[in-house]
């Protein structure tokens, strides 16, 4: 009797080995079904907003805009096929400036690409870098709660990271 119990427990412990693992991300869970808001843009490895501004007045204007509901938002819509997902991106940059385009991501190698067809920065430095980050993003990291888009600004060797969080699902 005791031997049978140990054999059953042993078989149950082996089940995870037979179920296999998938080494790609669930791109649909990461990107779709939620609105994401920019938290900050930083150099890769950093944890605070990069200093894009020439003076405190510009920075304050950008940060006040970032704090508003409905600004710096992105919504990814798409369909998956194997490890690939592609679709439309929409959202807002700053008040009165909508965002639209297409995007794709690969769950196997974490590649990301966006083609932004609508979006203006209104002269705001953070908005300019937000749009540039979306347009130049080459890869992503994250999960269903946090999203990081990595990009290099035009003419720069430094990698930047756009940090997003979920505002609603």
Describe each PLM feature range.
Residues 1-9:
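Bacterial N-terminal signal peptides that target proteins for export
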Residues 16-20:
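C-terminal motif of bacterial Sec signal peptides marking the signal peptidase cleavage site
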Residues 12-14:
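Intrinsic disorder/low-complexity polar-acidic segments
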Residues 21-169:
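Lipid interaction determinants
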């Amino acid at each position: 009797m005791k031997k049978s119990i140990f054999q059953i427990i042993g078989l149950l412990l082996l089940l995870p080995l037979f179920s296999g693992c998938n080494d790609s991300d669930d791109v649909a869970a990461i990107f779709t079904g939620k609105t994401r808001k920019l938290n900050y843009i930083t150099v890769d490895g950093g944890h605070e907003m990069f200093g894009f501004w020439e003076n405190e007045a510009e920075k304050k204007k950008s940060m006040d805009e970032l704090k508003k509901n409905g600004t710096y938002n992105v919504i990814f819509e798409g369909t998956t096929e194997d490890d690939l997902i592609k679709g439309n991106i929409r959202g807002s940059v700053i008040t009165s400036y909508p965002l639209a385009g297409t995007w794709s991501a690969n769950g196997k190698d974490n590649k990301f690409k966006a083609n932004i067809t609508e979006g203006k920065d209104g002269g705001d430095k953070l908005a300019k870098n937000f749009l540039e980050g979306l347009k130049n993003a080459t890869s992503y990291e994250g999960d269903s709660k946090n999203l990081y888009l990595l990009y290099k600004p035009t003419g720069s060797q430094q990698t930047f990271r756009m940090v997003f969080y979920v505002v609603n699902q």
